[in-house]
Amino acid sequence: GHGRNDGNRVWPGAETLIADTAAITMEVRTVHPNLPVYLLGHSMGGGVALAAANAGADIDGLILAAPAVWGGEEIALPYRAAAWAGALVLPDKRWTGEGVVTIQASDNIPELRRMGRDPLVIGAPSSREFMGLIRIMDRAVAAAPHVTHPTLVLYGDKDEVTPPAPVDAAFEALAGDKTFRRYPEGWHLLFRDLQAKVVWADVADWIKDQS
């Protein structure tokens, strides 16, 4: 949904996203064979990163920021059914939530406005993408107990996008060495918030501690 990649903006599917992530880590490892490789995923990217780690991505550690792990039994059957029906009947319908859903993603209002004007940012997900996100979150939840890489989880207490309980559950399920950083003034876009420098510093310190 973001960036300058060629081709149409279509949902590639969970398997493609996970495979692409694994391929990128292999490429980075090839180019920098003497450096550790850490995979960072934010929101949906956190779910993809967690699933990719379990699928054999060649990494030394994992960083999950506000990860999308609201899957498995956390998603009620009626919600799943509605998402499936929407993806089947109106797959390309985009949902803005305007007038119905009021969610603030960050306390950095100028950055939110800039993102809203950026043509490379697609903020309104389609029905197909909603269903795809659910599948990714299911994969991430199932993967967590099998992931043994050192993992740093980041979460903001003011996050209005990712609920805290699934993040806490995924953290507890992780099988390897793990660290949780919680930010009382943090929102969903932790790396764009007004205190983003604090978050980036914590990431850098954690990586240094792994060496």
State where each predicted segment sits:
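Catalytic nucleophile-loop/oxyanion-hole region of alpha/beta-hydrolase
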Residues: 3-33
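Alpha/beta-hydrolase fold nucleophile elbow
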Residues: 32-43
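Alpha/beta-hydrolase-fold enzymes
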Residues: 42-126
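Alpha/beta-hydrolase active-site loop signature
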Residues: 1-3, 69, 187
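Active-site nucleophile elbow and catalytic-triad environment of alpha/beta-hydrolase enzymes
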Residues: 125-143
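Short alpha-helix in the alpha/beta-hydrolase fold that links the catalytic acid
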Residues: 149, 163-172
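Short beta-strand/loop motif that positions the catalytic acidic residue
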Residues: 147, 153-155, 159
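Catalytic active-site module of serine/aspartate enzymes centered on a nucleophile-bearing elbow/loop
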Residues: 177-211
